[in-house]
Amino acid sequence: IILAAGNSQRFRSNIGKPYQKIAGKSLIEINLNKATKFRQIKKFILVYNKKDAKRVKSLKLKNVKLVVGGKNRQQSTLNALSYLVNQKGISKVLIHDVARPNFSTKLFASILSNMRNYRAVVPKIKVQDAIKQVIDSSKEEYVIGKKRDNLFFTQTPQAFNLKEIYYLHKTNSGKYKDDDISLYMDLNKVKFIEGEKSNFKITDKLDFENLRDIYKSKQSVGIGFDVHRLVPKRKLYLAGLNIKSKLGTLGHS
């Protein structure tokens, strides 16, 4: 399940985050292209905001079930789970935020591998910065420190037993916190695995530019040449342009 039904309010753009493009691909397509490399994934569900129906259609996605999102993340997730739980032969589900397109295939494979032995698998990374809690917002100098030893950030994709996470969403909507794992941890044991710093969430345009820079660093540019014999009675094309000449290439360039 790829969640892409938010309003992207903090991103501040006429085009929502899911449809922003890097190297010619939207964030939706980047996420899907990575996930489709794994044969274990039998169905793909994209949860979208109904106001973006035209944008979704323009992507011309293949083999992807489109589900309209709800008024919040929990309702959007439940809408997708409600569809998936009625599909035959599916017992596990991965739930992923479209705003985290930079997960590696190594992390994805690790999540799938751990799901063989656990009912919930979630990537996490340690908090390394100093943490402070403000006691009085009007007097920010009064703060208390928080020990970092037991603090960490969770990431997506997050994997679950399908029936269990569906039941929890359906029966605990009023208790919903921030992500799916916070709901699951109240009742079940969770396997945490090492996440990736590069799997950051795109919240604002600065995050997006950071991601764009990462993709630029992966690109390679080179210069090459080709040789063709020139013969009479043929047109000369270079880079697709017809060049006036008495000779033309015995080939295409």
Identify the role of each PLM range.
Residues 1-53:
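N-terminal glycine-rich phosphate-binding loop and ensuing alpha1 helix
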Residues 74, 79-84, 210, 217-253:
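RNase H-like, Mg2+-dependent phosphodiesterase core
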Residues 21, 102, 159, 178, ...:
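Short aromatic/basic micro-patch
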Residues 1, 5, 139, 185, ...:
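SAM-dependent methyltransferases
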Residues 2, 28, 80, 97, ...:
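Residue-level signal for inorganic ion chemistry
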Residues 59-92:
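Short phosphate-binding loop-to-helix
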Residues 102-193:
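Conserved core of the sugar-phosphate nucleotidyltransferase
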Residues 48, 55-57, 135-140, 228-242:
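Acidic-glycine-rich active-site phosphate/pyrophosphate-binding loop
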